[in-house]
Design a protein with these regions (language model features):
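C-terminal peripheral helix-coil segments that are non-catalytic and often amphipathic
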Residues: 94, 98, 127-132, 147-214
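Amphipathic alpha-helical packing segments from all-alpha helical-bundle domains
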Residues: 68-69, 90-94, 98, 111-137, ...
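Alpha-helical DNA-contacting segments of helix-turn-helix folds
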Residues: 56-63, 115-119
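Hydrophobic alpha-helical connector segments
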Residues: 58, 71-99, 200
């Protein structure tokens, strides 16, 4: 007689797997470790998921990156229009909070998975948005500054989402992070626009308001 699979056990395995993937990364996580975290035997995990790849696909759906990109683009467009708060900000934040550990994987633990390109794509997407707001292409030095800033953004968000004790703490930490990040980004972009207009290519200084951008 075939064993009946229980939704509660499946959910427990998926929760344990997502936490392991977010904490240690896909490559460093074994099915035995997931089983231990779920409080069951490895053989039981394989009754629900034929492989680690199948388990990953269940907890990080294939459409998750595209959904995240759409919300991110909408949020950045709102910021470009001077709307730091509003529906776009709320929708992206809710997505991060609803999919906390899956977003951690997308932003910082994607190596060896079908979403391996997501961390670099996140940074590249934000850099391209920033470049489009400039009157001329940035110099190589200024573009490298943008990459550094947005890579730090990626890492900070992933850290907050992975380490926060609960949804409300994550929300509070992200709000505090943005209160620091957004003014710094405003200062950085003002300096880069000025450099692009005068064609000097000179690097912004702390006096231009860059100090809080990272």
């Amino acid at each position: 007689m075939a064993q009946v699979l229980k939704p509660a056990v499946r959910a427990r395995i998926e929760t344990a797997a997502l936490r392991c993937f977010a904490d240690r990364g896909y490559g460093r996580t074994s099915m035995a470790e997931i089983a231990a975290a779920a409080g069951t035997a490895p053989a039981n995990v394989y009754r629900y998921f034929a492989s680690k790849e199948a388990l990953f696909a269940a907890v990080v759906p294939a459409d998750l990156p595209a959904r995240h990109d759409r919300l991110l683009d909408t949020r950045v467009a709102a910021l470009a229009e001077g709307r730091a708060h509003g529906p776009a900000a709320a929708e992206l934040l809710d997505f991060w909070l609803d999919q906390r550990l899956a977003v951690v994987v997308l932003l910082d633990r994607a190596e060896g998975t079908p979403v391996a390109g997501c961390p670099d794509a996140f940074v590249r997407r934000l850099v391209e948005h920033a470049e489009r707001s400039l009157p001329a292409p940035p110099s190589a030095v200024h573009r490298e500054v943008l990459v550094l800033v947005f890579d730090n953004t990626r890492r900070a968000l992933a850290h907050i989402l992975r380490t926060a004790e609960d949804r409300e703490q994550a929300r509070a930490m992200i709000a505090a992070f943005w209160s620091y990040q957004l003014p710094g980004l405003d200062g950085l972009m003002a300096a880069l626009r000025a450099a692009a207009r005068d064609g000097s290519g000179s690097s912004p200084t702390a006096a231009d308001g860059v100090g809080g951008a990272t």
